[in-house]
Curated annotation (Swiss-Prot):
InterPro entries: PGS1, PLipase_D/transphosphatidylase. Belongs to the CDP-alcohol phosphatidyltransferase class-II family. Functions in the biosynthesis of the anionic phospholipids phosphatidylglycerol and cardiolipin. Its EC number is 2.7.8.5. PANTHER family: CDP-DIACYLGLYCEROL--GLYCEROL-3-PHOSPHATE 3-PHOSPHATIDYLTRANSFERASE, MITOCHONDRIAL (PTHR12586:SF1), CDP-DIACYLGLYCEROL--SERINE O-PHOSPHATIDYLTRANSFERASE (PTHR12586). The keyword ATP-binding applies. This is CDP-diacylglycerol--glycerol-3-phosphate 3-phosphatidyltransferase, mitochondrial. It comes from Cricetulus griseus. ATP binds at residues 121-128. Residues 1-25 form a transit peptide. GO terms for cellular component: endoplasmic reticulum; mitochondrial inner membrane; mitochondrion.
Length: 553
């Protein structure tokens, strides 16, 4: 009984951290009240959520001008640092990538230059020639590290999902075994296995579908002090013709340390791949599917939350040292010693969601951002798989901001043309899309909430995240980028991570705006005529099955 009880205690502690944030406090209260229940099972929409514009607090107006050291210009988002560490960086260290090819070349180049650490977290590693190129780059860098005149002791840590990474005779594990066998002291491969896939369920569900129960879905690629956050996996299509989003954080040591520790934490509660292709648990750790589930989840919660708390404490101390007057001398001394780093104009917040471990930070932050988006603000939200949670749908339909939601047309859905039952998944998404569009029209919200479908010949679409434009602004000041899809799986089943980037830099805002425009330019607006097209006719059995399976994809 200890595990369920831990949830409300966690929320009460968070409430104590949030004085003066009634909107966020209200959300935390709601999350606490519904702990242990599935809001997705409600048959009716909660009518009070449609009053969200009246219930949400007025966004405070910033009256003091921003200075070079204090993030007053983004004051309205500082509440996020009550939940997670806040990393202040210069926008010159942030670069937005635009294409799969650029992403692939960056990964290879960064691996080749790494001297100290390579940390990669992904759903899986593919088995084709492009993926082999990455493995070869890792092998070459490890070899060079050991043979150099001054060995750099390069360490490689890879975190993948167990079910997806073990599928088929040739898989992620077999791709990485040569590295593990040749460099056993320098390579670690961790395979996360959800605690929810166990017992009879694990025996009965076919290999192709067992990943529906829960996954390691985090996508972080880290090289020394450089970090790539993305929604892209390590597979050939993500390097060629599967559109995603990517941001490159250069020379950001504190952020790199945080994500290294996060991947280490998840790795410690995962199965460890051995040189003979067997797996084992870390000494002293509860087995994820053979051991006691509650004990495993408690241990995993503690391991991950310790990383978040310690990083948050470190950043608070750093913030205090930077901004207090008694630290001015040390700043001058640092500058004289050659530390010429520009003052931060951009703030990075890591948002973690691991509902199996009762960690719901990303959910809290996302709901609060949607709740507090004022009239006149614009939210551009994109997901490769349009299957919003009920809470997110309620907030989109019930708040004041304008929404443009970008989703995949059936032809660029990753499941389009798949064999068997999976081939019907694009039709299920069309059905969900049509239902949501019907609600938008039924509420007379067509002018405020707009759906757009991405289409590109020969490509698939996997981009996710959002861009927030404050009222009266033509450029975004905040973006969310990472692995979550805003759907039931992301919130309830999988391990997810993304970052909130808040910036005052016009140059970075221009980068983010251009990224958004490039994606939306390849889309068309959804109207009632969209669903009358021949390819949009959904079979009756798909309509009947969709409500039963929508929480699994």
């Amino acid at each position: 009984m200890a595990a369920p009880a831990a949830g409300p205690v966690f929320w009460r502690r968070l409430l104590g951290l949030l004085p003066g944030r009634p909107g966020l406090a209200a959300l935390l209260g709601r999350l606490s009240d519904r702990l242990g229940r599935s809001r997705e099972r409600r048959r009716r929409r909660s009518p009070w959520l449609l009053l969200a514009p009246l219930l949400s607090p007025t966004v405070p107006q910033v009256t003091s001008p921003p200075c070079c050291l204090c993030p007053e210009g983004v004051h309205r988002f500082q509440w996020i640092r009550n939940l997670v560490p806040e990393f202040g960086v210069s926008s010159s260290h942030v670069r937005v990538l635009s294409s799969p090819a650029e992403f692939f070349e960056l990964l290879k180049g960064q691996i080749k230059m790494a001297k100290r650490r390579v940390v990669m977290a992904s759903l899986y590693l593919g088995t084709g020639p492009l993926e082999q190129e990455l493995v070869d780059c890792l092998e070459s860098s490890l070899e060079k590290s050991l043979q150099s005149k001054f060995p750099s002791d390069l360490k490689v840590s890879i975190l993948l999902d167990f079910t997806r990474g073990s599928r088929g005779r040739k898989n992620s594990r077999t791709m990485l075994l040569p590295l593990l066998q040749r460099f056993p002291e320098h390579v670690r491969v961790s395979l996360f296995h959800t605690p929810n896939l166990r017992g009879l369920l694990r025996l009965l569900i076919p290999e192709r579908f067992n990943e529906t129960i829960g996954l390691q879905h985090i996508k972080v690629y880290l090289f020394d002090n450089n970090v790539v956050l993305s929604g892209a996996n390590l597979s050939d299509s993500y390097f060629t013709n599967r559109q995603d989003r990517y941001v490159f954080l250069q020379d950001c040591a504190e952020i790199a340390d945080f994500f290294t520790e996060l991947v280490d934490a998840v790795g410690d509660v995962s199965l460890q791949l051995q040189g003979d292709d067997t797996v084992d648990v870390v000494d002293g750790m509860v087995h994820p599917y053979k051991g006691d589930r509650a004990a495993y989840c408690r241990a995993a919660n503690k391991r991950v939350m310790d990383v978040i708390h310690s990083a948050r404490t470190r950043q608070q101390l750093l913030h205090a040292q930077t901004f207090h007057s008694d630290s001015l001398l040390s700043q001058e001394e640092a500058a004289a010693a050659g530390d010429r780093r520009p003052a931060p104009d951009t703030w990075i917040y890591p948002l973690i969601q691991m509902k199996p471990f009762e960690i719901q930070i990303d959910e809290i932050v996302t709901e609060t951002l949607l709740t507090e988006a004022e009239r006149g603000a614009k939210v551009f939200l994109t997901t490769g798989y349009f299957n919003l949670t009920q809470a997110y749908m309620d907030l989109v339909l019930g708040t004041r901001a304008e929404y443009q939601i970008l989703l995949a047309s059936p032809e660029v859905n990753g499941f389009f043309g798949a064999k068997g039952v999976a081939g019907a998944i694009p039709a299920a998404y069309v059905h969900i899309e049509r239902q949501f569009y019907g609600e938008v029209c039924g509420l007379g919200q067509q002018d405020r909430v707009q759906l757009q479908e991405y289409w590109r010949t020969g490509w698939t679409f996997h981009a996710k995240g959002l861009w927030l434009y404050l009222a009266g602004s033509s450029l975004p000041c905040l973006t969310l980028i990472g692995s979550p899809n805003f759907g039931y799986r992301s919130v309830h089943r999988d391990l997810e991570a993304q970052i909130a980037i808040v910036t005052e830099s016009r140059a970075l805002q221009q980068q983010l705006h251009q990224e958004q425009e490039q994606l939306y330019l390849r889309s068309s607006v959804v109207t009632s005529a969209t669903f009358e097209q021949p390819g949009r006719q959904v079979k009756l059995w798909v309509k009947m099955v969709t409500p039963l399976i929508k929480n699994f994809f």
